[in-house]
């Protein structure tokens, strides 16, 4: 907890004591499961605080809307940390590997999270009965693949939230004409080596009246 408090001082985030306890508990659960199921290449719990917890929750101030889906979530990143500090928002966490979804289900039970829905599916095959205000991805795919594979999940007013390292103009150039970059935000992740960016993308709305 002391390490987490130290890291949080270098951000604008103000989680409650219960939320901080749950973030630490999530790290302990991930570390425990990782020994048996190899869920992440990060082995040190202190490193997990920086590379998985802080790297996820710094996105929180930029989320717009109430219902989100984290595609290719892996062991619930960034979805689980974001769900912990945003109890008023709903998060669907999608992955195609059973061991990852099993971990997420266990974490949801252990942490008593009521705003997380684990989904075992490939993103192209997932057909929900509603769309989402935001589609999140972290180390999932290129911007082009993310937008094309996930476009059926997003409302017309929603945003794609892509967590990236160094900003890559080639990825932007490869985007379909249906999508545009709305914002590129440089993220401050305390003690993380290397740059992190949040790329916000949206669908381009075509006014059919212009063609009549």
Curated annotation (Swiss-Prot):
Q: Does the keyword Transferase apply?
A: yes
Known catalytic reactions: guanosine(527) in 16S rRNA + S-adenosyl-L-methionine = N(7)-methylguanosine(527) in 16S rRNA + S-adenosyl-L-homocysteine
Q: Which UniProt keywords apply?
A: Cytoplasm, Methyltransferase, rRNA processing, S-adenosyl-L-methionine, Transferase
Residues annotated as binding S-adenosyl-L-methionine are 72, 77, 123-124, 138
Just give the chief location class: cytoplasm
The entry's cellular-component GO terms read: cytosol
List, alphabetically, the Gene3D superfamilies matched: Vaccinia Virus protein VP39
Indicate where this protein resides in the cell. Cytoplasm
* A Pfam family annotated for this UniProt entry: GidB
Q: Which InterPro entries does this entry report, sorted A to Z?
A: rRNA_ssu_MeTfrase_G, SAM-dependent_MTases_sf
MF terms (GO), sorted A to Z = rRNA (guanine-N7-)-methyltransferase activity
Please tell me whether the keyword Phosphoprotein is annotated for this protein.
no
Could you say which enzyme class this protein belongs to?
transferase
> Which EC numbers characterise this protein's activity in its record?
2.1.1.170
Any idea what job this protein has? Specifically methylates the N7 position of guanine in position 527 of 16S rRNA.
- Of which family is this protein a member? Belongs to the methyltransferase superfamily. RNA methyltransferase RsmG family.
Alphabetized HAMAP family for the sequence: 16SrRNA_methyltr_G
Protein name listed in UniProt: Ribosomal RNA small subunit methyltransferase G
């Amino acid at each position: 907890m002391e390490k987490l408090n130290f890291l949080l001082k270098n951000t604008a985030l103000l989680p409650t004591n219960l939320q901080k306890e749950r973030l630490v508990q999530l790290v302990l659960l991930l570390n425990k499961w990782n020994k048996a199921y190899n869920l992440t290449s990060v082995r040190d719990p202190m490193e997990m605080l920086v590379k998985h917890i802080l790297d996820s929750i710094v996105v929180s101030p930029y989320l717009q809307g109430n219902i989100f889906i984290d595609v290719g979530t892996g062991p619930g990143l960034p979805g689980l940390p974001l769900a912990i500090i945003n109890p008023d928002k709903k998060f669907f966490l999608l992955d195609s590997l059973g061991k990852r979804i099993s971990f997420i289900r266990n974490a949801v039970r252990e942490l008593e999270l009521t705003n997380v829905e684990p989904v075992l599916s490939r993103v192209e095959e997932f057909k929900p009965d509603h769309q989402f205000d935001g589609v999140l991805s972290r180390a999932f795919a290129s911007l082009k693949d993310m937008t094309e594979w996930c476009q059926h999940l997003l409302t017309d007013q929603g945003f794609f939230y892509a967590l990236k390292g160094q900003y890559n103009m080639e990825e932007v150039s490869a985007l379909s004409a249906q999508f545009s970059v709305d914002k590129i935000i440089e993220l401050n992740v305390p003690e993380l080596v290397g740059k992190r960016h949040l790329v916000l993308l949206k669908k381009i709305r075509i006014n059919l009246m212009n063609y009549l």
